[in-house]
Design a protein with these regions (language model features):
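Tandem repeat scaffolds
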Residues: 29-235
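Bacterial N-terminal signal peptides
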Residues: 12-23
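Bacterial N-terminal signal peptides that target proteins for export
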Residues: 2-14
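Exposed boundary/loop context
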Residues: 3-6, 23, 33, 38
Length: 236
């Protein structure tokens, strides 16, 4: 009996030791914050704020929870990178490629996404108030439940994108284009700038949304909806 117990304890101890080693290796890999920027790098939860990372290749990288506050990521390859819950406040991703990237639940106030190619990216539940998406390719992007107050979409391509349940208060879509229907189901349109926008093929729009938005005589609406007698906004 004593020998069996000793062997059992020895085996249990070995298993525990192996588990500890694997756990340590996984933790070390997750905290590889000193690794250079490279495709597939694992920077999860690392501090990368106030850095110049312009032109880097971070395709497929694990960037979950990274602090990129005020970091320069312009002209970078962010293809399929995972930025979930990352902090990108006042960072710049201008002119970067981010097709299929994950930006779920990021914190990105006043962030520069201008001219970014983000086809098929996900910004679900992201906080991107006052951010700049001017001239960006946002086709088939998911902005479901995103906070987009005062965001700028001048001349952006938003074809096929989804803004359902998003907060678009004072967001500016003037000059935006789309060749495939976009979904505005129950999005908050308080003083959203839609002057000159052809929304005739958009989906999910209701009269109550238009009544609080800012359009003009050139704004085209889906069938069954009408222009308010007076749009709320009269100044640019």
């Amino acid at each position: 009996m004593t020998l069996r117990r000793t062997r059992a304890y020895g085996t249990s101890g070995l298993v525990l030791a192996v588990c500890i080693v694997f756990a340590w290796q996984n933790a070390a890999a997750a905290q590889n914050c000193d690794a250079a920027a490279a495709p597939g790098v694992n920077w999860q939860d690392c501090d990368k704020k106030l850095l110049i990372l312009k032109g880097q290749d971070l395709s497929g990288a694990n960037l979950i929870g990274v602090d990129f506050t005020s970091t320069d990521l312009r002209n970078s390859n962010l293809l399929a990178a995972n930025f979930e819950k990352a902090t990108l406040v006042r960072a710049s991703l201008a002119d970067s490629t981010a097709k299929g990237a994950r930006f779920d639940k990021i914190e990105a106030y006043r962030t520069d996404f201008s001219r970014m190619d983000a086809q098929g990216a996900v910004f679900a539940s992201a906080e991107v108030q006052r951010s700049n998406f001017q001239d960006a390719n946002l086709t088939n992007v998911d902005f479901t439940k995103a906070e987009l107050g005062r965001a700028q979409f001048h001349d952006a391509d938003i074809s096929g994108s989804r803004f359902s349940f998003a907060n678009l208060a004072r967001a500016d879509f003037r000059g935006a284009t789309f060749t495939a229907p976009i979904d505005f189901d129950r999005a908050f349109f308080f003083q959203t700038r839609i002057e000159g926008l052809d929304l005739s093929k958009s989906a999910g729009l209701s009269q109550w949304q238009l009544n609080m938005a800012c359009g003009d005589a050139q704004t085209e609406l889906p069938s069954g909806l009408t222009r308010p007698e007076d749009w709320p906004c009269s100044e640019p």
